[in-house]
């Protein structure tokens, strides 16, 4: 039976997530966490502007978190209902369209990941500490939010936890205040951020600088001390990656970049805004995960600064990050992007060709074929435009839509300005059909910029 608060889905890929009637501009989270009992208490302030007059509003929020009080614009809500992963609240008075909507939620509970078709995502208890890995819909496991990637906002996150632990969140560390046996860490992420990219990392970590002092982009490692030697070897070339990607993609979009390595093993690394999280198994002292180091760094441009408006366009994140792996290989003395692209195409040709990359469906949106064929789409475009125009396009793409939401149509439209020949056919066969196209020959006819 549908709840009386049911509304038509924002996104068919995640019909339970996202909310109507307002746009969030800021989150202020005050959190307290006890690692021994995995107990989280929080106060969340959500600042928004209404888009229409309506009697009630909803937020995404896990049922593992118990709500004790809700305020709307400083007054108690007439009532609130927390069910089926939604917190529905009714203000005492209707708010006009364009009016300020400030929601304060007090809550506590034992957070746990959200189960979905892609496994468990969100808050995860570690052997000692916790991590948050929310893609695509796990943010509601630890705070009430408008959990859809098109909803980007600034964040202030305060986290109080036991003093032996280091607590990391997105953005700049504003303060670190020890008190008795606990420490409060306060972080500010001024750049707009999608809810799934917000993160908390808590563990027995130490913070180290990565690279030389005075690097254009400050980089740090937050890692268990026992992994320092392996990390220094495995991530030694990250400053070179940063320099390369800044040259090819445009300026790094945030103030700094931090890599976390957990003391636990992780199946795959995880991107967050300004942060990437790796497992201890990715830090082997043999650079066995270097392509993933490049992949996660590239997500700071493609996924974090430029964030999809709808999940069907996931190739705009993963195809670009996968292609960045090939760009790094090419620049660092490994196989060229063309060699890797042709090898990837040969491998894809042996697999089922039953996915449309531009709309793969929710079940397959994290399928490796989306990643690889997305990267192949970019390589086909690069062969069509040649290097100079291709990388000029990428830099304009990241500059024009910096800290914004994006669609495939916007990228296709922008790319069209870089070629006298129509490009829609290229995008149509690579993104809009199931059969795997052939790559153009290396060194084929280049088209001229029309601008």
PLM regions with names:
Residues 1-41, 68, 125-129, 445-451:
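N-terminal, polar/Ser/Thr-rich
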Residues 62-124, 181-184:
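A surface-exposed beta-strand-loop module
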Residues 29-32, 46, 77-78, 90-95, ...:
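Beta-strand-rich interaction surfaces with strong enrichment in secreted/lumenal proteins
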Residues 268, 314, 318-380, 384, ...:
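Acidic/His/Gly-enriched intrinsically disordered linker/tail segments
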Residues 276-339:
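Zinc-dependent metallopeptidase catalytic helix centered on the HExxH motif
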Residues 45-65, 143-147, 155-162, 409:
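Surface-exposed beta-strand/loop patches in extracellular or lumenal glycoproteins
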Residues 16-19, 97, 106-156, 203-205:
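Glycine/proline-rich low-complexity spacer/linker segments in large multi-domain proteins
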Residues 42, 145-294, 323:
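Hydrophobic helix-coil surface modules that form long, contiguous segments used
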């Amino acid at each position: 039976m549908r709840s009386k608060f049911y509304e038509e889905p924002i996104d068919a890929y995640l019909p339970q997530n996202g909310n109507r009637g307002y746009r969030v501009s800021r989150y202020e989270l005050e959190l307290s966490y006890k690692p021994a009992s995995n107990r989280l208490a929080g106060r969340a302030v959500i600042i928004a502007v209404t888009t229409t007059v309506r009697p009630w509003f909803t937020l995404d929020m896990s049922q593992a978190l118990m709500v004790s009080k809700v305020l709307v614009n400083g007054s108690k809500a007439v009532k609130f209902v927390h069910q089926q992963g939604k917190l529905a609240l009714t203000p005492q008075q209707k708010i006009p369209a364009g009016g300020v909507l400030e929601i304060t939620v007090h809550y506590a509970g034992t957070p746990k990941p959200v189960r979905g078709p892609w496994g468990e995502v969100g808050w995860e208890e570690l052997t000692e500490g916790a991590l948050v890995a929310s893609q695509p819909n796990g943010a509601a496991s630890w705070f009430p939010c408008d959990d859809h990637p098109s909803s980007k906002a600034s964040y202030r996150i305060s986290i109080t936890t036991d003093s032996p632990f280091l607590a990391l969140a997105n953005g700049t560390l504003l303060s670190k205040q020890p008190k008795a046996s606990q420490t409060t860490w306060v972080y500010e992420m001024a750049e707009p951020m999608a809810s799934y990219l917000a993160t908390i990392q808590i563990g027995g970590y130490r913070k180290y600088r990565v690279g030389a002092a005075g690097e254009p982009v400050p980089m740090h490692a937050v890692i268990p001390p026992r992994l320092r030697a392996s990390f220094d070897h495995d991530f030694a070339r990250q400053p070179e990656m940063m320099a390369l990607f800044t040259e090819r993609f445009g300026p790094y979009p945030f103030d700094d970049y931090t890599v976390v390595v957990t003391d636990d093993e992780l199946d795959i690394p995880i991107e967050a805004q300004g942060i990437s999280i790796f497992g201890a198994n990715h830090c082997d002292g043999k650079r066995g995960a270097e392509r993933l180091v490049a992949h996660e760094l590239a997500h700071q441009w493609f996924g974090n600064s430029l964030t999809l408006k709808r999940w069907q366009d996931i190739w705009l994140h993963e195809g670009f990050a996968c292609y960045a792996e090939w760009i790094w290989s090419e620049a660092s003395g490994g196989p060229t992007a063309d060699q890797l692209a042709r090898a990837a195409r040969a491998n894809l040709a042996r697999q089922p060709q039953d996915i449309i990359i531009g709309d793969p469906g929710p079940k397959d949106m994290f399928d490796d074929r989306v990643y690889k064929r997305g990267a192949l789409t970019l390589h086909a475009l690069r062969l069509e435009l040649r290097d100079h125009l291709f990388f000029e396009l990428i830099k304009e793409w990241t500059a024009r839509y910096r800290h914004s939401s994006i669609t495939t149509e916007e990228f296709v439209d922008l790319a069209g300005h870089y070629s006298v020949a129509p490009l829609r056919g290229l995008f149509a066969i690579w993104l809009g059909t199931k059969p795997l196209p052939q790559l153009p020959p290396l060194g084929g006819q280049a088209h001229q910029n029309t601008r």
